[in-house]
Amino acid sequence: MKNIFKDKNIYILSVENDQRDKCKSYLISKKALVEKRFSKKVNIIITSEKTILENKFPVNTATKLGIEIIDYETLSRDIERFIRKTQPTSSNGSTSTTTTTTTTTQKGQIVSFKPTSSTSTTTNVINTTTTSTTSTTTIVDPIISLIVPPSGSNNGSFQIAIFGIGFLAGAGFRIKIGNDNGGGGVFASNYEFHSSTSVLCTIPNLNIKCGQQPIYASNDGGKTFGFPIQFLFFDTSIHRIPTAREQDGMVLKSQLDNLKRAISNIQTMESILMRRISLLNGNHDDSKSIEQIFIQQQNFIESGASQLLLGNGGTTDQLLQSLEGSEYSSTNDDGENDQSDDDDDNEDDDDFVEKNSNQVKEEFSEREIKIFISSPFKDMQLDRDQIVKVVIPRIRKLCIERDIVLSYVDLRWGVTSNQSEQSTGLSMCLKELEKCNILIGLFGERYGWSSQEKQDPKSQQLLQSTLDRAIQDFPWVKNYRDSSITEIEFRMLLNQRQQQRNGFFYFRDPYYLEEVSQMDKNNFVSEGQRSKEKLEKLKQEIIKSPFKSSEYRRPTNLSDVLYEDLEKYIDKKYPSGNCELKGFEKERFLHSVFIKNLTKIYITNENYFMEIDTYLSGSATSSGSGNKSISIGSSINSGLLSSLKNKPVFLIQGESGSGKSSLISNWLKQHKEQHPEDLVVSHWIGASPSSNKFTSILIRIMNEIKNQIEIDQKIANGGSNSSSSSSSSMFSTTSTSSVSWLPEIPDETFESEKIVSEFPQFLQYVMSHPSLNGKRLVLLIDGLDKLDPRENSQELIWFPRNFPHNVKVIVSSIQGSRQSEVLKKRGSHILSILPFTEAERKSMVRLYLQKYAKKLSDQQEIAIAISKSTTNPRFLQLLLDDILVFGDYERLNDRIKTLLRAKNTSELYEIILDRIEKDYDPKAKGLVSEFLKYIWAGRRGVEMSMLSTLLLKKNIDPAEWGSLLVLMEAYITSSSGVISFLNDDISKAVEKKYITTPKIGIEIHTNLAEAFEQSGDLNERKVEEYPYQLLKSENWESLKNTLTNLYVFDKLYTPNHKVDLINYWNVLEKQTKPPKNAAERDDPIPYNCSNEFKAIISRSFIQASGLVISDVWFRVASFLEELSQFDGAEVLYNKCRELYINNSQNIEAAKVDRAMGRMYLTMGQNDKSDSKFRLALSIYTKERGQEDIEVAITLNLLGTLATNRCKFDEAKQILNQAMNICESKYESNVLLIADIAYSLGSVCFVEPNRKLEVAEAYFARSLELTESKVGDMDVAYARILTRLGSLNIEKDTYADAEAFFKAALKIYEARLGIDHSRVSQILRHMISLYEVQENYKMAEQCCIRALAITKKIYGNSHNLVSATQIRQALLYNSMNRKQDCLNLLNEVKVTREKEFGPDHKQVKHIIDLIKEIDKPIVPKAPPPPPPSSSSPSASSLLMKSITSLPIVNGQAVLSVPKPPVSRGPNGIPIPPPPPPTIKLYTNMVSLQSVMKQNVGRIPVAQPTSFNSPVQPPSPRTQQAIQQGQQQRQQVQQQQQQVQQQMSQKVSSLQQQPQQQQQQQPSQGYGNRQNTPLFQQPIFQQQFQQNRIQQPQQQPQQQAYVGDMLAQFDQQKLKRVQNANDRSGASQIVENLIGKKKCSKPVSLVNKGYMEESNQIDMGALFD
């Protein structure tokens, strides 16, 4: 085409933005002038075909003026060619092969039919008919569209299948790999053609460069090539070749894609031919039309499009109408024909963004009411206050009920002095009014600011400049230069009436002036006679207008009148019962409103956005999903990208109020604009009443995915109206059931476990469906920390650990929350939100206030921005919100200073509450304080009905606090009728401000408790709140009665409330009962859970209608067992077993037997436990068979019992049998499999030939399974951690052992309370750990605390208490606190004498132990040397006295004068004689020697001689002795001095054997090589025979299961290396046996609890 555009003025109309930009560039290159608006000077209009057909302005005007009109599609090919020349070639080429262009000329017009690609199904139709020419151009260069497989080895020598368009089978066909069109590269070989669209070829055996390489196709021997497609060559050593199955799948998928393209091409050609027929028919005047000839010849087009000719008589016009409504009609539509003289590019851009940004916003945009309040300022302050503080809250409540969004604009101080100086005030007001759909106008006696008012020249000049500025934006204002600003605002509604806008005008009674003080009256009277006349004229015009107008007496009356009018307006537009949304639609509406509020103002942080985008593109294409990816080298840091790979979840965390939700919502808005092809589903916890339940989250996500897929299908099918016309084609790929393949979605009635299990299956099925090929799903869940804590949701068991490759998940939570900890342990990528910078704060202030048409001065903005408190976004927003409702601009500076005095958000809330009290409780009736105190006192909030009753007792009218409720919607939230605070900061502020004494808090809790007591039904709310309120009100007797109520217990003893029930009893048992007599007053009786329930069961008749009493007693007994109150549990177990047997319920009786066996196992009563287990096993086997799940559970317990009884082979056999049953039939019972794995690991850990690595593997597997099912804060999880701690002690990895123990201790304390038997069990293990490390201080603290807990549970005389006391005494002995040790042992002796008698062996054992510790240690003298033939010389006496001294490191302790050195015959000094052999003692008893022995058995150490036979002196020694005799006189003078020094060292010598004992290498942690006083089997037998049972005490244990680790065979344990080994013996042992190595299973490496537990301050646990 020749250049017809040179020097022409061209106007582009109704063309999409991206095409508009390309067209502009093309026209500029043709030296054309592009006009922004249509005018007479325009020579050519370029527009869409649809706009031409509509023939509206400016097309119709251009036609009359003879201006050329060109269809944009006519130029599209030239424009695309121009763009390709000016921009780098894209890696993905075009997929079209043939372009047919039909050009029609009429009256200088140039019109073209749309060039259609292979993937297009649209057709342009016009009715212009004249001369036509048709030209067809064939593109000979073949185009590649797909390669299978998409990657291969860089070594080559493999085949690939290439699919595309225009392949010509012949010698000239080439496939080239690498380089560009200019030559070079590698050519493929062995071409095997299957069609013109597919070919099989071989990549040659060459070393090709790794990475993405282009592959081209050529039909002319390689001279010219079509557009390339990228192929990934990888290093064979890193990547693998796809399997044959994978390649076959890709080939089939590609064939299906080619079939779809073929159908699309046929449909395209079909539509072109049909249009040509219509044109031919229009160019002839024959009576017989073309379609009739066509029908007579019966040459039907096989695709079925010819049926369009037959519809409704088959006329051409009807044909065109059918085509316009069919799927071939143009989709290039702007939605409405709104082009005018004011149309420009910027407006088009805004329209485009608005229409494509947010579909939800468009869907619910009609459900929004925005009010603009207009009036003169000086005399209408009180009136406007009534609207803002009274009417708006009441109307907002009504809007909430009708699912309507309400907002308002009040510009009392929004026009700052700076804006006034710049004269932008009126323009800003009119712009805000333009966005509103309701105007509320107020008038008193003042007309308002106008030229009629007497004012100084400066004000007059300011008014004129303000009007001039407004005229620039709103030209119609020039007609009202003499009017007041208020009238001009009114005129915008009166003169430009629109259907969607409405107005309410109110005129105050002139007699109100009589109530105004004389001082203020000047602000209320008219400005002058002319102003009065203009005001009266305006009022008359308003009264005659269709808008509502009324009069009111005083400001207080205005609220009633205005509310009534607005209520009628809402009732008419949104009628009650018809407009409310329901179900899924209402959820979508509430979430859309929530998002809209978050996206109004946001200071974009590009770093945050980039990191989220990087996560999404991290591995988008690695799995072949077809998702778009971002170039690593261009815009993504490769290090960050590699760190994001394999990260299942992207976690955004930060402090409360740090802006996490705003970040997600605004990123979401941008992402939808940039990636409309993605499926994006967001869930905002807190947006709706049910949004915090994890089941609702999963169900809503599945529904949203289904809804979006349905919408996408409708859009792809050309809208809902295209179904009928599209069905005429036999090749149509659409159907009315296009989404029928979607699986059924569960609803709220399903069990939570089923919903959780079906959710990942739903995602996997949907995202792998062929119709979603290349789609990516982005899931966003905001506010995980706000989850309802019931059903253990905070452990995120419901949250999938793995997602499909094309699903990306982004979540947010408060930093440090339980949810964040869980996601960190799962390896999620973490983005931490930082505080606001000063620049961000300043921008936030300006933009936030600008949204409400207000602005602060520069000084005020700076004061807020530099404050340290405003670094928190929530703090800053609260401050700005308070400023917005502050109506007095004159005192605004003082208000800002007051707000900035707050150091944190909680203090800011206190200041805000002061303002709310002054505004809404001026008479100090306690409206605000009482309202907030009751919300504070509720555990999970307070019901509105109950709050109304409570406030009514305080003489507060419900209508008053109803408005307050709406007013404070920014601070409170409502969920299912329950009101609660939005965050903890508000609760802290209310507590600090109003709960000033404990008495006030108790009174509030008491009122709530009474309210719950009066409520009839025992619903979930009452079960959750009533005991809590009794606890907080310290009403102990009522709390006891409530907890022992069988109906309440049945509701509380559930997974959701069990922890609460345990905590209630833990607190209650620390209290005492009200005294009934003087004796109880002097000796108060504490509450005891076991005694209270035993008292109930002793009654003759128990009222429990509706409950199965035997089942209830079984549950009570299980609860008492959990509390370690075994005596009461045993009584109740026997009671419910009796009931089951009487009713012939054998299975239930077996359940009781097994539970009792488990309890006896815990108590260490192995014989009773074995009897109960075997009885239960026989019943289950008989009733249900040998492979029932109940049999497996019982076998697991029997295996544990066999392990405790050291029957390890039997234990393995039983446990393997249980495991086989589970793995064959009950794979889903993960917890049971984990428990059996734990039991097998315990056997491997404690058996004689221990296998620590095997045991650790079992424990690791059990830990992994348990965590997947119940999380890492469950008691079952803590039990495994305890065992791993003991195992690591044996492996000498004390740091890991301590971490495991601390993690288990944390769980037990959180779940079971700080005084539970499991806690004492952990503490006893930690005593052993710290004693081995000689950290006696920490060991003592653990021992003291464990002893206190054990005494509380078992009583002072229990055997386990005595054993713990003995461990503490020996610990004191190791700490050289001998007297404390003896005192404690004497206390144990007295206790055992009372229980067993003075002659019992345990008493004698304690006595022997006391004697051994109290006995002074005196070293024995070494044997004398052999007698000499001669008399002893002085030298021999000296040596004898020296050798009698203790030896340390081979030298005598005392220094004595050395005798003269004797020399031999050659002058060589004679060597001294060797020192005599020293006899060592081991009669010191230490904690290490007994800490792992059985309970109640303490070994007494016996002296062991390590001396060797004394050797006779050597000849040299004899010679030295002979020479020493010559010095006898000299030695005798020194002998007396040496003996005196020896006597002074006797006390120090007593300690040396103990030190030597500690320096010896020994075996097993805590075991010494000594001979115990009693052998274990004999001692246990005698102990059982002689033990005296006390009815008041609990049964004595044979071996406490919690101390099972202390029952190992000590002779077979190796001594661990002591951290503070001073003798060097450990080094010798290490050299002999080699250094130990610790190899943890992979699942235990880098566990989060290891680091967390190491940070626990153990000292803080004992404060």
Swiss-Prot record:
It comes from the Eukaryota. Residues 84-109, 326-359, 1500-1528, 1544-1571 are annotated as: Disordered. Disulfide bonds: none annotated. Residues 1516-1547 form a coiled coil. This is TPR repeat-containing protein DDB_G0287407. One of its GO terms (cellular component) is Cul4-RING E3 ubiquitin ligase complex. Residues 89-105, 1518-1528, 1544-1563 have a biased composition (Low complexity). The keyword Calcium does not apply. TPR repeats lie at residues 1110-1143, 1150-1183, 1192-1225, 1234-1269, 1278-1311, 1320-1353. InterPro entries: AAA_16 (IPR041664), DCAF12 (IPR051191), DUF4062 (IPR025139), Ig_E-set (IPR014756), P-loop_NTPase (IPR027417), TPR-like_helical_dom_sf (IPR011990), TPR_rpt (IPR019734). Residues 333-352 have a biased composition (Acidic residues). Keywords: Coiled coil, Repeat, TPR repeat. PANTHER family: DDB1- AND CUL4-ASSOCIATED FACTOR 12-RELATED, TPR REPEAT-CONTAINING PROTEIN DDB_G0287407. It holds the Pfam family DUF4062.
